[in-house]
A protein has these predicted regions:
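Multi-pass membrane proteins that catalyze or facilitate reactions on polyprenyl-/lipid-phosphate substrates
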Residues: 1-265
Length: 265
């Protein structure tokens, strides 16, 4: 992999990981459309750690407060808002982790085709539009009860299907259970910390077992570019979300899905 390819693929990962348009779909599609060889497991690990570093850095104050309050609540059994949000993130992660272990091979074998990606891109794009139009949008992320967290957690499982978008489906579910746009996005990004962390650790395990040669320049480029682009993406997405809504992302998904159908049918 040359540096130009590393920069492009890292930008794709960084710019799509937190937008509701599916990073996995774009990373699958770019090599198909460009004719590039698969970027390899080591590069996948690099860009996952890059985006993980971005979200942890951006939400470092919130994550630190949540961790302290959660640990304190274990002793006092009197959780405050930050501790309850930490419990919500933990609960919201369990179904994804279990499903990832159970269905990983099935998904890798049968659900990574361009036509599957085209279908999920369109279907879940329309669902995002519906949720944005009809959701009550009256709650913040600190007012999530167990039932609403479970709905978002189960929705996140669908993100295992390429083209769905983890951020897209969790924001959609958040809007459907009454979160406002910013709260739905923030909770989605908090959920991404364990989600991306689990993916990075799983890929790291596979990388160590495979003992493949590593292009350290491409790896360093992937971490840096994906991390910086992801951080900027989070910042500007949250800044502009209430103003622009979800419609631009819905339109993008519909256009992308149609283009994929035309190309691969």
């Amino acid at each position: 992999m040359d540096i130009f390819q590393a920069i492009i693929l890292a930008l794709v990962q960084g710019l799509t990981e937190f937008l509701p348009i599916s990073s996995s779909a774009h990373l699958i599609l770019v090599p198909i459309l460009t004719g590039w060889q698969d970027q390899g497991l080591a590069f996948d690990v690099a860009v996952h750690f890059g985006t993980l570093g971005a979200v942890v850095t951006y939400f470092r104050t919130e994550l630190s407060a949540m961790a302290r309050s959660w640990l304190s609540s274990l002793a006092t059994r009197n959780p405050d808002d930050e501790a309850m949000l930490a419990w919500a993130v933990l609960l919201g992660t369990i179904p994804l982790g279990v499903s990832g272990v159970l269905f990983h091979d099935l998904i890798e074998t049968y659900l990574r085709s361009p036509l599957v990606i085209a279908t999920t891109t369109i279907v879940f794009g329309l669902l995002l539009w519906y949720a944005d139009k009809t959701g009550a949008q009256t709650r913040c992320e600190y007012r999530l009860d167990t039932g609403r967290v479970i709905v978002i957690a189960l929705a996140q499982v669908l993100a295992l299907i390429p083209g769905t978008s983890r951020s897209g489906i969790t924001i959609t579910a958040g809007l459907m259970v009454g979160l406002d746009r910013s709260a739905a996005a923030r909770f989605s990004f908090l959920l991404s910390v364990p989600a991306i962390g689990m993916a990075a650790l799983y890929e790291t395990k596979n990388l160590l077992e495979a003992a493949v040669p590593v292009d350290w320049l491409a790896i360093a480029t992937g971490v840096a570019v994906s991390g910086v682009s992801a951080y900027l993406c989070i910042h500007y997405f949250l800044k502009l979300l209430e103003r622009i809504g979800m419609l631009p992302f819905v339109i993008y998904r519909l256009v992308l899905g149609v283009v994929l159908f035309v190309m691969f049918l």
